[in-house]
Structure formats: C-alpha cells, structure tokens
Amino acid sequence: MSAKGVAIITGAAQGIGRAIVVRLAADGFDVAVNDLPNDAQVAKLTELAEEIRATGRKAIVVPGDISQEAIVEKIVADTVEQLGGVDVMVANAGICELSPIVSTSVEQWDTTQAVNLRGVFLCFKHAGKQMLAQGRPGRLIGGGSLGGFSGLPMGSAYAASKAGMRALTHSAARELGPSGITANSYAPGIVATPLTIGNYGQEFLDSQKATCAVNDNGTPEDIAALVSFLASKESRFITGQTIMIDGGRLNI
C-alpha cells in the first residue's frame, strides 16, 4: 500500500497532536511523531506509532525539543532517511503558562517564545528546505490559537507567540508559494485537551460552551479534520492563512 506522502507532526503525544497523527495516517500518510524526549512522552509516542503501524502505515518516533535547531534538523533528516522525504510538516507543539503581565518573568517569556515561535520557525525552515530540495509541492502547517487574534488575559507571552506565528505563516507562504509549498496555520478556540483542562479545569471548559455560536467546545478531532484538508492536494489555493476554528467564539 503506497503512501499518500510523509508527514511530521510535533507535539504528537496527546491532545490535538495525537488526533492529527491518527487522521493523517487514516488519510494515507506515513508519519513521524515528535514530542519531548522524556520517558512518559516517548512511551506515548511509541504506543501511538505502534497503533499507526497496525493500520498498515509506516510510523517512526522522533523525540526532541523543537526549540533547538540541531534537534529539528535531525528530526527532518531522520524522517527523510527512514520514510523517504517530507511532504507535510505540522508544527503543533506548544506550551502555555498562565501568568499576569506584571509578574511574568523574562525566563517565562523567553521559554514560551522559544517553543511556540522559534520552534515553528525551525520546523518551517528545515522542512521547507527539504521540500525545496525534493522539487515537489509541500504543506507547512502551524498550530496557532485564537489568542493570537484576540489576546489572552493572564497569557500575554502565549498570545504574543501565536500572533508572531501568524506573521511567520504569512511570510513563509509568500516566499515558498512559487515552489508549490503552502503555509497555513489553524487557530483553535476552546478545545478539551490535557493542556487546556490542566490550565483551566473542566468546570471552566464546560462554562465556555455558551460563548460559542454552536454552544459547544471543540474536540481534537475537529482540529485534525481541518489539518487533514490543509495537508491535502485540494488545499493548493489556500496559503498564508491562519484559520480560526472556534465554533464562532469571536463572532458572537
């Protein structure tokens, strides 16, 4: 069974990232799955890769901190060596540490930018370089946030990193478009993931349903469905976009 292509997904151990891996594999992609290189996350990645292989697709585990350039270079190189190329990069990994502006430390700020903005830049840079070398169309996809549009009280560092990612996405689209490489990002609203539940609690998430036009929160699978389209050939005329997927939250 030939592959539709090869996709790298960062932040893949749980939540939205995991759902994206499952969806892209179901779409026919072979996958390289990434998350932090600690025992707990690697165990989750290994289990996920085994689940994907059981469906007939290829899957490799490429753990590492995507804020480090040498690590991202190795992730791309290992993927090319073991799976044959890179057609889709989903730079999904991100962190969110809540803190008022007046008590946010420089270290908190820098760590957030390193993962959420520099990490996406490095993924786009090295996957984009590989796509150019391959001489065929590719898809760069970033994990944004509604906070990149609206700001986020108690989350200024996070919101700023996601706003920066919007500009990065637009810039990459304009640079790489002539080579058939598109760059887009998805900006979820409230989605029930381990990260959001850990930061806000289930009671808060339940209370937010009424703030959405559809009277519900999103699921990781909702986000994965959008990524599935952005990764497809059918999305070729969409680029430079950060697409809000928020149940109408900003429109009511």
UniProtKB/Swiss-Prot annotation:
From the UniProt record, give one GO term of the biological process aspect. Answer: fatty acid elongation
Pathway per the UniProt entry: Secondary metabolite biosynthesis
- Enzyme Commission number(s): 1.1.1.-
Membership in a protein family: Belongs to the short-chain dehydrogenases/reductases (SDR) family.
Per the entry, what this protein does is: Short-chain dehydrogenase/reductase; part of the gene cluster that mediates the biosynthesis of erinacines, cyathane-xylosides that show unique biological activities, including leishmanicidal activity, stimulating activity for nerve growth-factor synthesis, and agonistic activity toward the kappa opioid receptor. EriH also catalyzes oxidation of 11-O-acetyl-cyathatriol into 1-O-acetylcyathin A3.
Its EC top class is oxidoreductase
Q: What is this protein called?
A: Short-chain dehydrogenase/reductase eriH
| Xref: InterPro entries | NAD(P)-bd_dom_sf (IPR036291), Sc_DH/Rdtase_CS (IPR020904), SDR_fam (IPR002347)
What keywords sit in the KW lines?
A: NADP, Oxidoreductase
Q: Where does NADP(+) bind?
A: 16, 65, 92, 125, 158, 162, 191, 193
What reaction is this protein's catalytic activity? cyathadiol + reduced [NADPH--hemoprotein reductase] + O2 = cyathatriol + oxidized [NADPH--hemoprotein reductase] + H2O + H(+); 11-O-acetylcyathatriol + A = 11-O-acetylcyathin A3 + AH2; cyathatriol + A = cyathin A3 + AH2
Pfam families named in the record? adh_short_C2
Q: Where is the active site?
A: 158, 162
Q: Name one GO molecular function term.
A: oxidoreductase activity, acting on the CH-OH group of donors, NAD or NADP as acceptor
The encoding gene: eriH
- Source organism per UniProt: Hericium erinaceus
